[in-house]
């Protein structure tokens, strides 16, 4: 039944788009995987998880490809025909109408989208880590009022280790502490 369906598109033009999705994730790939097939359908707006689901496409893909799990361009067309057949069974429309609707959406799509990739934003991290008001104890001395680090002077207490005895610290502090 699916084999009788015809494709109303320019094969060479769609083949270029098919190649782009085939190479998505593997630049040297020559056959499309089920994952890339689902991405192609999802980016085109065909795979909506209501009328056409990933399960439907997975079953159709494995019917055509069998154990090899990858499809050539002609095999991909057969998979599309199976998907259109499943969709037509649900919608009670002719298979050719469903296939035309699917192929029209796929033909409009240029290349895989890479939307949703997270971009690192470190501005919040730096402002949080250099906000001296959030630190307590000796750590709050590491930054000045603008949040700029003081360097070694903020990390270490500098004392003068000079005097008449080797371990004597804080030279000239006796008179200050004993009131003389």
UniProtKB/Swiss-Prot annotation:
One of its GO terms (molecular function) is tubulin binding. One of its GO terms (biological process) is microtubule bundle formation. Residues 136-180 are annotated as: Disordered. Residues 136-158, 169-180 have a biased composition (Basic and acidic residues). Signal peptide: none annotated. Regulator of microtubule dynamics. Belongs to the TPPP family. This is Tubulin polymerization-promoting protein homolog. It comes from Caenorhabditis elegans.
